[in-house]
Curated annotation (Swiss-Prot):
Transmembrane segments: 9-29, 34-54, 64-84, 86-106
NCBIfam families, per database record: PRK02237.1
Name of the protein: UPF0060 membrane protein BTH_I2792
Main localization category: membrane
Organism: Burkholderia thailandensis (strain ATCC 700388 / DSM 13276 / CCUG 48851 / CIP 106301 / E264)
Membrane topology according to the record: Multi-pass membrane protein
Localization annotation: Cell inner membrane
């Protein structure tokens, strides 16, 4: 069984792989960046799919819990990569999503 820290790191890595895999095509289509960026985007999305298989819970439960982490990582990306300041509403929404994720991910298994 993976430790809580390893599961959290796996969720974050999974989210980054998904965001990169979607952000690069966005750059190609919306910002006129070179089309070769689609190759690393495809690799990143393949990595994302593979990382999802490493999570210890049932697939649907993993996807549900992952959603909360994805929201927090996407907001961090918005701030760090896109340079957009976050609002208190962003922070509150991420906190609520992470709380919901925690309820799903940390439920007793039996």
């Amino acid at each position: 069984m993976l430790s809580l820290a390893k599961i959290a790191a796996l969720f974050v890595l999974t989210a980054v792989a998904e965001i990169v895999g979607c952000y690069l095509p966005w750059l190609v289509l919306k910002a006129g960046k070179p089309v070769w960026l689609l190759a690393p985007a495809a690799l990143s999305l393949a990595l994302f799919a593979w990382l999802l298989t490493l999570h210890p819970a049932a697939a649907a439960r993993t996807y549900a819990a992952y959603g909360g982490v994805y929201i927090a990582v996407a907001l961090a990306w918005l701030r760090i990569v896109d340079g957009v300041p976050l609002s208190r509403w962003d922070a509150a929404g991420a906190a609520l999503a992470l709380a919901g994720m925690s309820v799903i991910a940390l439920q007793p298994r039996g």
